[in-house]
């Protein structure tokens, strides 16, 4: 007599794999932000979602209505990042931001510390190559003077700045965590994915 076996459903196994993957992704995110809670770490964050590219030619720093700004998705991204950071123990960070409104708004919506404008975090898109290089050197010099044993520092900036410092190309609301080195330099230790 031929032995017949009933085919098993793959759904329970598939569900188990999906839940395990989700659990690992959540753990990795929490661990990543816990790095920032350790002394001598910096989060270099691209501003949250602001539809479009660049800014209009008549853009003025003092007038947000002339700039690209966060949309609802961007505001929700910034709030979600702030919640994740606070859950990892980052509650009293030094937060520096580009002067553009989309960065300032992202920094404020994180709600993890006092926000201060830092001009060297502003976009370099409209600068000449010598101006761009000078600004990046000034930002590197600022980072080199941060205390290696200090609390968390967050820089809210633009993709061009993150890329110039780390060769990373984060999506809006994404970034990298840097470890400050004793010699005044830094190294990239983790990527921060943008919240969905």
Give the role of each language-model region:
Residues 1-8:
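N-terminal secretory signal peptides that target proteins for export/translocation
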Residues 12-23:
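Bacterial N-terminal signal peptides
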Residues 28-127, 133, 168-196:
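Active-site-proximal alpha-helix that buttresses catalytic centers in soluble enzyme cores
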Residues 40-42, 151-157:
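Generic beta-sheet signal
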Residues 137-147:
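A short, acidic, amphipathic alpha-helical segment used as a generic capping/interface helix at domain edges
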Residues 146-149, 182-183:
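A short, structured loop/turn motif at beta-sheet edges
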Residues 164-165:
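Feature marks hydrolase-like catalytic cores characterized by long aromatic- and Gly/Pro-rich stretches
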């Amino acid at each position: 007599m031929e032995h017949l076996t009933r085919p098993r459903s793959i759904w329970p196994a598939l569900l188990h794999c999906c839940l395990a993957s989700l659990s690992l992704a959540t753990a990795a995110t929490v661990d990543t932000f816990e790095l920032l809670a350790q002394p001598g770490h910096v989060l270099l964050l691209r501003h949250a979602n602001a539809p479009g590219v660049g800014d209009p030619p008549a853009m003025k720093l003092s007038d947000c209505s002339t700039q690209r700004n966060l949309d609802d998705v961007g505001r929700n991204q910034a709030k979600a990042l702030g919640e994740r950071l606070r859950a990892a123990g980052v509650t009293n960070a030094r937060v520096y931001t580009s002067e553009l409104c989309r960065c300032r708004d992202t920094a404020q919506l994180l709600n993890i510390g006092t926000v201060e404008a830092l001009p060297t975090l502003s976009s370099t898109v409209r600068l000449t190559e010598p101006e761009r290089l000078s600004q990046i050197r000034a930002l590197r010099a600022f980072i080199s003077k941060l205390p290696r044993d200090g609390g968390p520092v967050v820089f809210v900036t633009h993709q061009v700045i993150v890329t110039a410092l780390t060769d990373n190309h984060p999506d809006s609301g994404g970034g990298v965590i840097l470890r400050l080195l004793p010699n005044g330099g830094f190294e990239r230790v983790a990527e921060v994915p943008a919240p969905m």
